[in-house]
């Protein structure tokens, strides 16, 4: 099964190492794109802004407004706040993939994930990739998996004139979009 909306967001927060596991307290308002704020009846009214630490709390604490939603959550079938329903349906639609690749939250998260990899694995790209795969796969790795990813990052550097930082940022975004990260067996 695919992870639910809240599980996807929480997994990304955990992967980048910023999840706040504080229990209880008021709801939080994570950053949302300006286009989402502009769509509310009164631009941004009532949404507020939590500190970065509070915004990284688990998704169960995210403020829910019927007229305004966090894009990642709404695109991944968050609970319908307008009606009661004993079952939450799971869809797989192109907008989910587009949001996961192009959304502000995912791209910012990929950069933070890449920073975590640099801090934990040092400056060797192979070690950074190995650490990324350990985090997203949560299982022992095969050397061929690491080698393929190292080759892909080296291609980004050589063929697309990216520096190592930007190449790792893009690989981090790819890693957070892997099926094995988003689906459970």
Regions found by a protein language model. Name each.
Residues 147-158:
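Amphipathic alpha-helical segments that form the core helices of the histone-fold
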Residues 51-54, 164-168:
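Glycine-rich, flexible loop segments associated with nucleotide phosphate handling
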Residues 171:
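Globin-like tetrapyrrole-binding proteins
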Residues 1-136, 140, 175-185:
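An acidic, gly/pro-interrupted, aromatic-rich
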Residues 123-125, 158-167:
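Short, charged, surface-exposed loops that flank catalytic or proteolytic processing sites
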